[in-house]
Amino acid sequence: MAVEMLYEADVKVAALDGKKIAVIGYGSQGHAHAQNLRDSGHDVIIGVRHGKSFDKAKEDGFDTYEVGEATKLADIIMVLAPDEIQKDIYKDEIAPNLSAGKALGFAHGFNIHFGYIKAPEDVDVFMVAPKGPGHLVRRTYTEGFGVPSLYAVYQNPTGNAENIALDWAKGIGSARVGLLVTTFKEETEEDLFGEQAVLMGGLTHLIEAGFEVLTEAGYAPQLAYFEVLHEMKLIVDLIYEGGFKKMRQSCSNTAEFGDFVTGPRVIGPEVKENMKAALADIQSGKFAREFVEDHDAGFPRLKAFRKEAEGLEIEKIGAELRKAMPFVNQNDDDAFKIYN
């Protein structure tokens, strides 16, 4: 079902005016939301545990508190800590300091949708989910536009939750480029599916498989890297700018013919069935349970996955080749880190 895109002219609310806003967490999304809202004229404080993020928030000029104290002081509390620690932060520091009429916000529906956080019935619960990482939310705001966002309301005892969500999205710059209404269920399940089946899980394993096929057939690993990984950005940029049509128009007839002939052989019906199974695991809560259980055990599976991935030949080859390509390594890695 199609939904209508909203823009700044459609957001005729001032629900954040006169309110004290606490951004909980000062990592990838936290720093962007906080700085954009402050630059939009809103009263923002930071709630975060003592450590690197606490120091960084103070350095950036914010009044910074422990999470519980920030929750007490604020009218609107936006939880932007990593998914896996939100439930503990909420139970230990946020919940004891919530009171009727306050609003609780999220940028991803994971903990609310799967029931790891259960807000009191007299507290508004809303979501504003930018469709991009925090450094882009901040950078595009400073450049005069923004990143599109989804917004949703989970519960609305005050009758003002939707206005808060819309004004928040406007304050971080998203209304400049477009807002789409959703639900916590829809955002959570679609976001997880996109990450797992296409954007990360699907893409990285497709690249890895292509690299292995070429190198196992005797082709030079350096050439294989360029063919299946390095050129990926060039293709994705074209798709990003103008869809499949622009990408195909920008490539040779040989490449386009091969796309149509071989693509369905590689990504056949069985892949779609596997995707459906992955979606079912997300919808049932199976993936969420596995993720939370792994976190609670100290992330043994995630750490093992990371160690295995670090040993891949394509990663070693890529690290060497990128040393000779400074143009692909100019970003500040610190902008991509997520601090708890």
From Swiss-Prot:
Per UniProt, NADP(+) binds at 26-29, 49, 53, 83-86, 134
Reaction(s) catalysed by this chain's protein: (2R)-2,3-dihydroxy-3-methylbutanoate + NADP(+) = (2S)-2-acetolactate + NADPH + H(+); (2R,3R)-2,3-dihydroxy-3-methylpentanoate + NADP(+) = (S)-2-ethyl-2-hydroxy-3-oxobutanoate + NADPH + H(+)
Residues annotated as domain KARI N-terminal Rossmann: 3-182
Query: Can the keyword Oxidoreductase be found in this entry's annotation?
Result: yes
Q: Required cofactors, per record?
A: Mg(2+)
Q: What PROSITE patterns does this protein map onto?
A: KARI_C, KARI_N
Q: How does the cofactor bind to this protein, according to its record?
A: Binds 2 magnesium ions per subunit.
Keyword vocabulary terms for this entry: Amino-acid biosynthesis, Branched-chain amino acid biosynthesis, Magnesium, Metal-binding, NADP, Oxidoreductase
Q: Where does Mg(2+) 1 bind?
A: 191, 195
Active site positions, chain numbering: 108
Q: Which GO terms describe its biological process?
A: isoleucine biosynthetic process; L-valine biosynthetic process
Instruction: Identify the GO cellular component terms for this protein.
Output: cytosol
Q: Which positions in this protein are listed as binding substrate? A: 252
Entry's InterPro entries?
6-PGluconate_DH-like_C_sf, KARI, KARI_C, KARI_N, KARI_prok, NAD(P)-bd_dom_sf
Say which enzyme class the record assigns.
Answer: oxidoreductase
List the residue ranges forming a coiled coil, or say none: none
Known EC number: 1.1.1.86
Give GO terms: molecular function aspect only. Answer: ketol-acid reductoisomerase activity; magnesium ion binding; NADP binding
Pathway terms, separated by semicolons: Amino-acid biosynthesis; L-isoleucine biosynthesis; L-isoleucine from 2-oxobutanoate: step 2/4; Amino-acid biosynthesis; L-valine biosynthesis; L-valine from pyruvate: step 2/4
Task: Give residue ranges for domain KARI C-terminal knotted.
Answer: 183-328
Gene3D superfamilies, per the entry: 6.10.240.10, NAD(P)-binding Rossmann-like Domain
The answer on whether this UniProt entry bears the keyword Magnesium reads yes
Per the similarity annotation, which family is this? Belongs to the ketol-acid reductoisomerase family.
Sum up the protein's function in the record's words: Involved in the biosynthesis of branched-chain amino acids (BCAA). Catalyzes an alkyl-migration followed by a ketol-acid reduction of (S)-2-acetolactate (S2AL) to yield (R)-2,3-dihydroxy-isovalerate. In the isomerase reaction, S2AL is rearranged via a Mg-dependent methyl migration to produce 3-hydroxy-3-methyl-2-ketobutyrate (HMKB). In the reductase reaction, this 2-ketoacid undergoes a metal-dependent reduction by NADPH to yield (R)-2,3-dihydroxy-isovalerate.
What is the name of this protein?
Ketol-acid reductoisomerase (NADP(+))
